[in-house]
Amino acid sequence: YNLIDGVYQLQNTGNDLQTTLDADVCATALEGLGNDAGTVGVYNYKTGEVICMVSTPTYDVEDADDVQKAKDGAYAGVYINRFLSATYTPGSTFKIITAAAGIDTFSDIYEREYVCQGGVEIDGEWVSCMGYHGTQTLTEAFAHSCNAYFSQLAVDVGQQKLDEFAQKAGFNQSFAMDGISAATSFFDISATRD
C-alpha cells in the first residue's frame, strides 16, 4: 500500500505470511465430513488462531467443470463458508447451558433425577435419546449426553431462565474473526411452554 502512488501498487518485495491452519487436521475433518454438507472448525479462543476451517460441499478450483457446475446450481452452496456463514441447531453443546441454568435454579440439582427410556415425551412430542440410561443424576446424564434428562431439566428450569443463560452464552449475537463477521446465532424459545 502506497498512499502517494496508489492504493494497491505492487511492491518489488514480497512479505511473509504465516497461517495457523493445520493441514492434517483440515484433511481429517474433510474426510470425516465425507459427502455430507457441513463444517468443522477448531478455534483457539485464547489466541484467536483458527486451526481448522473446513466447509462442505467443496470444489476443486483447478477443475473448470466444478466451477461451471457451481454456476449452474448443481453445486448448491459450494461457495458458502459454513463455518462463518451458516447457523446450526446447537445440539448437545446446549446441554452445557441447560446444566448451568439448572445449577443456578435448583439447590438439589446434583441429586435431582430423571428417567431415560430411550427418550421422553415432552408436550406430546417424543424426544429421542441414543441410549436407555434409566434413572440418572445430572453428572451421569452429562456423561451420557442424555437427551431425555436434559429435555426434562429444561422444562423444569423454564423458558425465562434458559433464555437468560443462552443470552449470557452469546446466543443471538455475532462475533468476528480477523474482521470477518460470523453469522448471528439464533435462539428463540418464545413458542415453548413456560
Task: Describe each region flagged by the PLM.
Residues N2-T39, K46:
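Conserved, well-ordered alpha-helix/loop/beta-strand core segments that scaffold catalytic motifs
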Residues L3-Y8, K46-S92, I97-D194:
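Beta-lactam-recognizing serine transpeptidase/beta-lactamase-like catalytic domain environment
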